[in-house]
Amino acid sequence: MRDVQAVHAFVEKHRRRRQSNKVLHGHPSPVHWLERDIAMDEVLRTRARANRQIRKRVNLYVGTPYCLPTQPDRCGFCLFPSEIYTSHRQLDEYLGYLEREGDMFRDHFAGAELASIYFGGGTSNLYKPDQYPRLMEIVRGVFDIPPHIEVTLEGIPQTFSHDKLLAMKQSGMTRISMGVQQLDDELIKASGRKQSADQVFRTLESCETIGLPASVDLIFGWPNQTLAQMVRDLEAVAATGVTHITHYELNVAGRTDFSRNRRGELPSTEDNLEMYRVGKAVLEACGYTQVTPYDFEKQEAELPSSYLYEELFRKPFQSDENGPIGFDAWGWGYAGISFFFGTPQSPGWAFMNQVRIDQYFRCLSERRYPVMRGFQYTPADLRLHLLFQELQGMDVDRKAYQRRFGLDVVEEHTAVWEAFTDLGWVTISDDRVTVLGDGLFYLPLIQNALGYDRLEQMRHSRAETTMTVPAAAPRPARVAEEPAVWRWRRSSA
């Protein structure tokens, strides 16, 4: 949008609608990841060529497909792929296929240096204690694991135990991310989960005893949630001394139970904005510092954790004393999402693995890469993706953007920045573009405005392509827009 008034009109049209954040997928949404015939060997060779131009390290995500069954399905709100867990035989079988996928990629990652490891889901704490060493050994079958690397595992309260947490630490895992969502025992029932506040506190107590840093996810904007309930839960979790709290708005979309049957019980966007404001104030009063629109951490924690996976995901191109350095992300396993960025001048690919477990298994049984579809970045798309991600850190370094792309990020999007400056959501200096105030709550709206022109081009191109496809041709499977916080770790519904 080149006109400031057009941006203001866009904001007024959309500011009362529910938001869907872009923490994981950035730009563009997987709705536009339409390439199905991806020559993965060439993609991997292209990554190797990029590695010769910019030193590349790997953020590794290892997924687990399974979640406990709930009524309503998928905790009532989760938009992300998962399979229903029924027995440990599923996990044993899955680990065998995970190992097969690693075998296919091993030569391509020969000599690659890991930057961080994240075990996500599904629900990655469904495994038995003796399976966590095997998980780490599967990773070691492909990569050398550096000493002192950050290794995170996410899970849900009711499937943690002291023995399991101890096994996680002994196998090399250094951080736990717990998807609590609601502490209130009555509110959590809306999701069908069989968890209790006591399980949350016992898990955090075990983490402290063992010496394992932990983070907690809480959601606001829940059906029938009051401001007083939200404050009580935040204060109770903060009182445990947990080092990191992610507090994010419930995403409601698609065919989920919350979207179809509970919309009348949900707070309005204006109510959610007030919850965001109050939640931020409560957490800051409890000694937490805001580091993203959704994340709050204690800077002087007794059990420090760098949250490196998240930081590198926001800033995949950096520099150190040896020059430029890049951070690709490999999503290993069922429904894994990968970003092989290439270079700013020669962008690479984003792609996702199969989202049906039978298809994932079939591909690997046939010695085929289990990739479902993907997207090849243009230079303009890569700029938008990196801009979206850097904005998650609440500001953009203008000089670094200029060095990387040869463009000034303010001049590139003048009308958008001017409109959001008018609203008090953005400030601009010679060095930085900073998002502040209510702009942090409305960051998805800011990102939508920044990407509007390019997305319109893509929609028109897609429509023209669709017109040339016979009516009987299968349509691409829909992949949900990003829920209200990143889903490399928030996928444990």
What are these regions (language model features)?
Residues M1-Y61, P69, S461, T468-P470, ...:
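Flexible, acidic/Gly-rich N-terminal and inter-domain linker regions that tether
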Residues G336-A493:
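Charged, E/D/K/R/S-rich low-complexity terminal regions of large eukaryotic assembly subunits
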Residues I54-G96:
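Canonical Radical SAM [4Fe-4S] cluster-binding loop centered on the CxxxCxxC motif
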Residues I84-R106, A115-Y118, G122-L407:
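C-terminal scaffold of the Radical SAM
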Residues T64, G155, V435-L436:
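Hydrophobic residues in beta-strands and at strand termini
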Residues P72, G76, I188-K189, Q402, ...:
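A short local structural element in Rossmann-fold oxidoreductases
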